[in-house]
Design a protein with these regions (language model features):
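Short, flexible active-site-adjacent loop segments at beta-strand->alpha-helix junctions, enriched
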Residues: 34, 76, 109-111
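Polar/charged alpha-helical tracts
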Residues: 61-65, 79, 89, 93, ...
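Acidic/His-rich segments in extracytoplasmic proteins that coordinate ligands and/or metal ions
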Residues: 71-95
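Conserved catalytic scaffold of divalent metal-dependent phosphoesterases
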Residues: 11, 90-115
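N-terminal active-site segment of His-dependent metallophosphoesterases
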Residues: 1-72, 79-81
Length: 115
């Protein structure tokens, strides 16, 4: 079983790492500071929001779609410019809007991964 780990890519800073050569695998763990809930929930249509949307599409194609399962734990940046208790739902809603529902957020729960 291949489990990959990724953290601190900070998509909210509009700085895109190149994952196009990533081979994928069984499980991807996103270990925090991926993007802010405020940015992903945004309904803005300005240039920054459009660029962030483009990065999320690339994130899906170059990385998320290459894994059978994707789990995420929130870091501190996910909560920036959000109300702490709302962050998880804002991420879930934002991921759904960007066709990223495959990402399962772990928050005070666990998952067993079997080979």
């Amino acid at each position: 079983m291949k489990i990959s780990y990724l953290s601190d890519i900070h998509l909210e800073f509009l700085n895109w790492p190149d994952f196009s050569q990533e081979s994928g695998g069984d499980v991807l763990l996103l270990a925090g500071d991926i993007t802010t809930a405020a940015m992903i929930r945004s309904h803005r249509t300005d240039a920054v929001a459009r660029k962030h949307s483009k990065y999320l599409s690339k994130f899906k194609k170059d990385l998320i779609d290459k894994y059978d399962a994707v789990y995420m734990v929130m870091g501190n940046h996910e909560h920036y410019n959000s109300i702490f208790k709302n962050t998880k739902q804002e991420l879930i809603d934002g991921f759904a809007r960007h066709d990223l529902s495959k990402i399962r957020i772990l928050d005070n729960n666990t998952v067993k991964i079997y080979d």
